[in-house]
Amino acid sequence: MSLNDNTNLSSHTPMMQQYLRLKAEHPEILLFYRMGDFYELFYDDAKRASQLLEISLTKRGSSAGEPIPMAGVPYHAVENYLAKLVHLGESVAICEQIGDPALSKGPVERKVVRIVTPGTISDEALLNERQDNLLAAIWQSTRGFGYATLDISSGRFRLAEPTDRETMAAELQRTNPAELLYPEDFAAMDLIENRRGLRRRALWEYELDTARQQLNLQFATRDLSGFGVEQAHHALRAAGCLLQYVKDTQRTSLPHIRSLTIERQQDGIIMDAATRRNLEITQNLAGGSDNTLASVLDKTVTPMGSRMLKRWLHMPLRNAQTIALRQQSIRTLQDLNDSLPPLLRQVGDLERILARLALRTARPRDLARMRHAFQQLPQLNNELADSDNAHLQTLRSQMGEFTELRELLEHAIVETPPVLVRDGGVIAPGYNQELDEWRALADGATDYLDRLEIREREKLGLDTLKVGFNGVHGYYIQVSRGQSHLVPIHYVRRQTLKNAERYIIPELKEYEDKVLTSKGKALSLEKALYEQLFDRLLPHLAALQDSAAALAELDVLTNLAERAWTLNYSCPTLSDKPGIKLTGGRHPVVEQVLKDPFIANPLSLSPQRRMLVVTGPNMGGKSTYMRQAALITLMAHIGSFVPAEQAIIGPIDRIFTRVGAADDLASGRSTFMVEMTETANILHNATEYSLVLMDEIGRGTSTYDGLSLAWACAESLANRIKAMTLFATHYFELTTLPEQIEGVANVHLDAVEHGDTIAFMHSVQEGAASKSYGLAVAALAGVPKDVIKRARQKLKELEALSGSAASTRADGSQLPLLVEETSPAVEALEALDPDSLSPRQALEWIYRLKSLV
């Protein structure tokens, strides 16, 4: 039976009636219904949870004549189960008991106190500390898209208005939201259908006027012109839907969301989804984080610094002034690299602690960590005090010291607080006199009980008399069964044991009531004092958030300074003249993975040398050479130093890569279709200021189709678009392009054959490669010798069929399509005169030719 079958509430027990009413308010998400020490789920929720969480599915009696499916999780372990559900893209409504069971005539009063969704979590246990966790909303019209993202764990609110599908796909790839809200009539479902955490929303939630009202109310403004988003109608619709969703799920004010920013394409270097994937910036092609650019560059010591660095990597800047400030700071911080990281490490994740403070969900240990962070600020300020770097002084000023707040927390919170306020013992002794008095009363019970036991034992002469406490029956006086007949009449029996009797007397009962009252009073007062701490901290929230942002940036810059020093990076020069010139360029990731020294290579692109046709053997390093150019360019535009002896980089507006491909089975697209789609995107959107990497265009179809496509694409990039292009190919016909198109040059990666083996030199040389070494690479890979031998025979046949090992060039002249390897046996036969041989000599020649073959 499903929940929907139970429409007649009167046929259910009172408790199930309460559950069904609450569930009706949250029909699409799981409801965790608190019952004692467990959160229970019923009906379809129970079945779903048992599968997702791999917990037992049981039954709880029956209601309306049917057995009720039930599953449950213990309340003390709920965070682990919530983390698993959130990771799977599920949302959960948490229903707590808010009434007093002792005063309730029917079921204890319950209500949903919070809703946990993948995009709105702020609990430390549910978050990946080194990765942003974003909630996003999307809107679409005939004129483009609106897109809004919010990191509720920091308050960072961003808008964008992608104009086309490719740009929207790139934004989704860049931001990778944990939860995505979309309107019920959303047309471009293929863009989002494979994403996690999808939430379908009603159209009215995207109403523009309502969005403006919501945002003005949140920011306490009359209009949104101060944020520069007044005309961003599509993005505002998405932002309004997103903000209302957060308010509905969090059920509290959101003071840490203080502003919103629109991100415009012209502010940064644009990279489409394929480029971000191919460059393996934060995620490798297998979906992991090993051997990515972030894995090499991210040695930050705070989680908030790690998250900021990843945002920088995914949004390289075009603002030369900001980049220069970062470069100067990195240069200065190389001298402070020993002293700052240990201090910054102690700061921890202040950004997310402040978000929990704003949501009033911060736990005692959050406040202890905040206190510890404040304690590092004076020393951090001292370390930067003597620097003449203007940007570092700005960060120093923004960090502040918060002496008053530090002293408040030092006075208010114990050194090592418990996990939860309800456990008690959070507020430090001496902070509040009334609390100290109640605690003294509760804590004095042991002394009182010892005195009472001695007094009663001596007065009655009962050597077996003991005074104790039991969690069920409370305080008691215990006497052995053999002496129980000697107790006075005012001893009232409370419990009978096998060998003893337990009693209560009026004096002990009075003291018990007093102690229990004092414990309750102390805990109640402690909770109130804890809430008052929030009230005293929250007025400083804006300054605290600015401080956290400054500390995160200082961590990133210090980290990049350490990376530059440790990995021998140099400071790049950003020029206003078009082109890229690298001396001794290295791939930042590959050089860390290799056991052998990395072979550094130059790169020279300019308006007079716009395209390099890159040839050479498979495994020779063509893809590495191309990718390192893109990664060095990207690193330079986040302000980082780069792996090169020298780097001079001109204006760049976009980076495109067409490097490798796999079948997109989910969309029904073959490898070749994926390749052509990515190529079309480049040809439509690249400009003369773009950096384009094209690797093996046309290999997914027949030889002549592929060659024709590769030729035409190269011509378009060099003649029409004039983009800075690295064009790797196995089509040797393309090496004639420099003879026909101005601004095109050949380079190749060298290799040397030694008999049946091949040595890759990984060194970039001017000019075209002499051959592809395909069969040599196959032999190196372990292809059986008989297969290699057969391949050589077949190669000769194909070369013969194509016209004496030559194929027609695209311009009508001749060029070998497959380079022929001359056989020693053929050379010997060509030099032989059969008419001059004796029978014995002919036999000897047969054996010699056999050995040559």
Curated annotation (Swiss-Prot):
Source species, domain of life: Bacteria
InterPro entries from the UniProt entry: DNA_mismatch_repair_MutS, DNA_mismatch_repair_MutS-lik_N, DNA_mismatch_repair_MutS/MSH, DNA_mismatch_repair_MutS_C, DNA_mismatch_repair_MutS_clamp, DNA_mismatch_repair_MutS_core, DNA_mismatch_repair_MutS_N, DNA_mismatch_repair_MutS_sf
GO biological process, any: mismatch repair
Protein residues bound to ATP: 616-623
GO function terms (MF aspect): ATP binding; ATP-dependent DNA damage sensor activity; damaged DNA binding; mismatched DNA binding
Cellular component terms (Gene Ontology): cytosol
Swiss-Prot/TrEMBL keywords: ATP-binding, DNA damage, DNA repair, DNA-binding, Nucleotide-binding
SMART domains named in the record: MUTSac, MUTSd
PROSITE patterns attached to this UniProt entry: DNA_MISMATCH_REPAIR_2
Pfam families, per the entry: MutS_I, MutS_II, MutS_III, MutS_IV, MutS_V
Entry keyword annotation includes Nucleotide-binding: yes
Keyword Cytoplasm part of the UniProt annotation: no
Job description of the protein: This protein is involved in the repair of mismatches in DNA. It is possible that it carries out the mismatch recognition step. This protein has a weak ATPase activity.
Entry similarity comment: Belongs to the DNA mismatch repair MutS family.
Family matches, as HAMAP family: MutS (MF_00096)
Name recorded for this polypeptide: DNA mismatch repair protein MutS
Native source organism of the sequence: Erwinia tasmaniensis (strain DSM 17950 / CFBP 7177 / CIP 109463 / NCPPB 4357 / Et1/99)
